[in-house]
């Protein structure tokens, strides 16, 4: 490990601190949150032990070789906190104490977080002394706060809807920054009941959606339309163009439904409405799916009710997003495509493919990166054919800011916050 790194509370980063964090991962896993679930079994599959070599070196021992371990070590399940930061249950005993350029000095849930530049940071120091990150759920309120000068910029997922970004750019004092995002958007089908237990019906829906139009009309062309389950920021991503064939889709629907019409429920999470044009997107799907003999009823549910409906199978289609945990898609493929995958079960996808299970078992012991890529290519191809979930597009990380600040750009997940400073 890097020498002379300190936590925000003054403790030294060393092998003991890392081992304390891994012990905490084991103790609390699986630990759910509104963000990502902390689960060491999915983040570090097959991990047997964490061994101290010396003060600044440690060893991870696995059941099988892990050629993509470095990808896993930069995922959301791998933060390293001060070993004094946990109580006996593994929960935080105060504000998180990391090693980054900013220290969290104050936090009011659902209101704001106050960041302060950490003087003991080992790298280039943050340009701003203090940054207050406010929570403003409503996009119109965020835009109004930005235009009034109440805030200098917006950040995070769906920070500014593309339509509002277009409006904002009419004012020369504001700027937009956009880049690829690790977030993908899907239409989850309930594969445990008719009609979406039939892959032909899932294919019909997929071919009926004009993804290019969706991206252009509702997202102003910032995202990238795709039929690939895997996000395009992964080094294993395979480019797969959307297949828009409405007439073929109608034929498949007739094969499944005959002459009957089917009433279905499309559920939409309220948190998506705060970030994306999900209402308009749901209404678009409601319109186009009529031609597949599907009468869509839109149900808007809060986060808890949305998750419950999916787990109980009380839905037919669901608007959903998924982030890419890390560059190696093993965990993502396992969660969604494995017959015992956690997302497969909790979203009632009802997907099972013996070849997929075989490939996922095979990749666990595959050392060659070329062979690993071949396996992932096949998994992407199978997913595009079977559609356990229906991919729509890879999102774009889109942020907006007042030109009174500089050094503020979008990254694939977040912003260049340490570089932010006043322009004058």
Annotated model-derived regions:
Residues 1-31, 195:
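Aromatic- and charge-enriched surface segment that lines or borders ligand/interaction sites
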Residues 10, 290-340, 375:
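Periplasmic binding protein-like
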Residues 12, 38-84:
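Surface-exposed binding/hinge segments that line
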Residues 18-21, 58-59, 100-103, 113-114, ...:
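Short, well-ordered beta-strand elements
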Residues 27-36, 75-107, 120-127, 165-181, ...:
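Short, solvent-exposed loop/beta-turn-alpha elements that line the ligand-binding surface or hinge
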Residues 67-73, 255-273, 318-322, 366-401:
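Bilobed periplasmic-binding protein-like "clamshell/Venus-flytrap" ligand-binding domains
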Residues 105-116, 132-195, 216:
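Extracellular/periplasmic solute-recognition and catalytic clefts
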Residues 197-287, 297, 378:
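Append "and occasionally in soluble cytosolic enzymes with long acidic Gly/Pro-rich linkers
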